[in-house]
Amino acid sequence: MRLPIDVSKISEKDRTNPTVLLLLESIQKQAELIQELKDEIARLKGQSPRPKIRPSRLENTIKSTGKRKGKKGSGSRKKKKTVTLQIHDTIPIEPEDIPDGAVFKGYNDFIVQGLKIEAHNIRYRLKAYETPDGKYICAKLPDNLKGKHFSPDIVCFILYQYHQCGVTQPLLLEQLQEFGIDISKGTLNSILNENKNDFHKEKDQILAAGLEVSSYVNVDDTGARHMGKNGYCTHIGNEAFSWFESTGSKSRINFLQLLRAGHSDYSINVDAIAYMLVNKLPKQPLNAIIANRGTIFSNESQWQEFLVDNDIKNKRHQQIATEGVLLGSIIEYGISKNMVIVSDDAGQFNILSHALCWVHAERLIQKIIPFSDKARKDLETIRDQIWHLYKNLKEYKQSPNDNDKKRLQNLFDQIFNTKTHSAMLNEALKRINGNKSELLLVLDRPDIPLHNNSAENAIRDYVKKRKISGSTRSDSGRKCRDTFTSLKKTCRKLGVSFWQYLHDRICGLNKVPKLSDLIRQQILSTA
């Protein structure tokens, strides 16, 4: 943000004074804090805060100087866009005033695309017969109706409009009624939120399959109020799938519980004990846990009883122990110990092998405002060097080798150990340098991304839905929002039409493969 002091009025001599520069940077920090508090007050009042800072330039595309691939030449024939369309009706048209002796030579086709939007009501007349012995035999409704008074097509349309197109329930109700559909507010809500167990099951299979075959996942979270209380939605995914789950917490315990992919047990195994040792669990509780190595607790209640029985009462000790047995559980179920978690440096995601997003790291530099010519020059130099390093890391991913690995490590040290004329810039460089191992994990694992854009883009879609429809007010509503956001985003990543997917599942056609199978196929084919 802009400094609340006109720097141009400060003399050139004072601008080079270290004390003055330190004071200016201190004022800048205070101004940013004041603006953040103003933004929070504005949000609480229902007003709009200040606009966000411009995005990082790290992922800006380089303009191509050559010709675009696939661009048509001046002499190429124009491709007919309608050649593959299914034709539903054919209407021949005769010319006016055909003279005698004219010979028919064929047709000039002109394709018109249309869409029918109208009510289509069906009366099923279930025949009933009486047998000679006095019993009655009655016909049954088609299975895909499931005893409901609304066809699968209407159910598909409602789900698609609400989850894919972001149409709110009031507008969707008005739309259906204008189309001639006799439907109430309660019935619409029921169609959206009830009897969705098959979809919930497939959503859970998405996470299980993704964790089973992936070498990395991108993670992020966002606020998700529920029933008037603060809550959070966590995203787990990568280029092949997206999975969302809303809970009341954003702790590491919560994240580990989500990674269990539907399982509920707690395992004391080698991996659990190793985690507790790394996190310095004291000897007394650690010995009690080691003495029960190999024990599996089927649910949280049994685990809590174990903690009480073994006099593990300290909150921090309980936290470390619980995180350990949860980690032991997810590794027990097949998650690789080499799984990389790519995040924006939120502490709850720092488990297994942890990689950080370069775009988020560069934002620390981007927000700095220099107060002297030397500081401005230093900032420009550092940003150019970071851009050069990032570009080199992208090239390294395509062709990793030991020589480039060593060179890039040295380049990182050279950039982030630099001392500049800006105290704020020095502090930012020091902070980034402290995350060296997580930012340069790509040198050992060139299969992982350099940024967390995949998770950010996915969570942005959830935020858009939250802004349109507000917070959830029922458990079924929250569960359905998570489920259909997961299914929609995963379909998009797999190249599956969400409309065709909904139609296939609701009509019971089973022509679209399980999304979990498609995830395995896509990830394994690119491994």
Q: Regions from the language model: what does each represent?
A:
Residues 1-148, 189, 219, 265-321:
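Short, flexible loop/hinge motifs at secondary-structure junctions
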Residues 6-10, 128-130, 137-527:
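Catalytic center-proximal scaffold of phosphoryl-transfer enzymes
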